[in-house]
C-alpha cells in the first residue's frame, strides 16, 4: 500500500508539524497546491496558466474595478458610496440569474481594516437601510470572536447577500457565489492581495454563462495601491481612475 499526498492551501500548511505528519506516510509523491506557493527548491513547480483555468470555466473571465466611477466622487460618506455601488451590482447580477432560472445568490464580501469597530457599525447601518441585516439572515459577520449567519453561506442559493470580514476569509474559504468585493482594508502584502482577489474569482457552477455580468467579478475600493496591483493582475482596461474631492483627501481608514 502506497500513498500520494495532496496538500491544499500549502502556503499556510508549510510547517514542521505538517511535514512530520506527511513523513508518516513515507510517500515519494507530494502535490502542494496554492495560488501563492512557498518556494521549495527540492520541488518541481508546475504552473497552471490563468487562461487555461478560465477556458475550463472554473474562474471568472475578468476582474472589473470601480466600474463606471465618475472622475470626481461627490459623497459625504465614502464607505456608503462603495457599498451602494456594490449592492446595485449584486441586484443587477441576481436579476439575470433569476431570469435564467439559475439558483445563485451573488455574495458581496466587505473587507474591513483591523481595529475598525466604528467602520463595521457604519457598514451594518448602511445595509440595515436596505433591509439587509442579521435578523433576516441576509447579512453575515465573520470576524474574530463574532460569527453570525455563517451557516450555509457557501450554498449557491444561500440567503446571505453580504458578509463582513477582516482576514479570516482570505485563505482557504470556499464560497464560489462570492462575486463582489468591497475592499476597505489597506496595506496588505502581495500574498494576501492574491488570496483576497481569489475569493471572488470562482464560478458558482464551474462553468461560464456567456453573459459578462455573470462571468465577471467586481471590486469597489479607494485603496490606490490595491487598484494598481489589480490593474497589473487583470489588465489596465478594467480600471477607471478615481479622483477624490479635496476636502476628503485627508480621510483615512
Question: What name fits each language-model region?
Answer:
Residues 1-4, 11-32, 37-159, 177, ...:
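Helicase-associated low-complexity regulatory tails and linkers flanking the ATPase motor
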Residues 4-6, 109, 164, 182:
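Structural motif
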Residues 8-12, 169-170:
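Catalytic acidic motif of RecA-like/P-loop NTPases
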Residues 164-179, 196-200:
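SF2 helicase motor core recognition
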Amino acid at each position: 500500500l502506497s500513498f500520494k499526498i495532496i496538500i491544499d492551501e500549502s502556503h499556510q500548511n508549510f510547517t514542521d508539524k505538517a511535514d512530520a505528519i506527511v513523513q508518516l506516510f513515507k510517500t515519494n509523491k507530494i502535490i502542494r497546491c496554492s495560488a501563492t506557493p512557498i518556494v521549495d527548491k527540492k520541488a518541481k513547480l508546475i504552473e497552471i496558466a490563468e487562461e487555461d483555468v478560465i477556458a475550463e470555466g472554473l474562474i471568472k473571465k475578468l476582474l472589473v474595478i470601480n466600474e463606471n466611477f465618475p472622475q470626481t466622487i461627490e459623497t459625504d460618506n465614502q464607505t456608503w458610496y462603495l457599498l451602494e455601488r456594490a449592492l446595485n451590482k449584486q441586484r443587477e447580477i441576481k436579476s439575470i440569474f433569476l431570469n435564467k432560472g439559475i439558483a445563485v445568490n451573488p455574495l458581496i464580501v466587505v473587507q474591513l481594516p483591523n481595529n475598525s469597530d466604528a467602520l463595521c457599525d457604519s457598514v451594518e447601518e448602511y445595509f440595515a437601510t436596505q433591509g439587509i441585516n442579521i435578523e433576516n439572515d441576509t447579512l453575515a459577520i465573520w470576524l474574530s470572536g463574532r460569527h453570525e449567519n455563517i451557516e450555509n453561506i457557501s450554498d449557491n442559493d444561500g440567503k446571505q447577500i453580504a458578509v463582513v470580514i477582516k482576514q479570516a476569509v482570505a485563505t482557504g474559504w470556499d464560497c464560489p457565489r462570492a462575486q463582489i468585493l468591497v475592499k476597505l482594508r489597506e496595506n496588505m502584502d502581495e500574498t494576501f492581495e492574491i488570496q483576497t482577489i481569489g475569493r471572488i474569482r470562482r464560478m458558482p457552477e464551474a462553468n461560464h454563462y456567456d453573459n459578462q455580468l455573470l462571468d465577471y467579478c467586481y471590486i469597489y475600493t479607494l485603496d490606490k495601491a490595491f487598484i494598481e496591483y489589480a490593474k497589473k493582475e487583470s489588465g489596465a482596461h478594467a480600471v477607471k481612475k478615481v479622483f477624490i474631492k479635496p476636502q476628503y483627501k485627508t480621510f483615512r481608514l
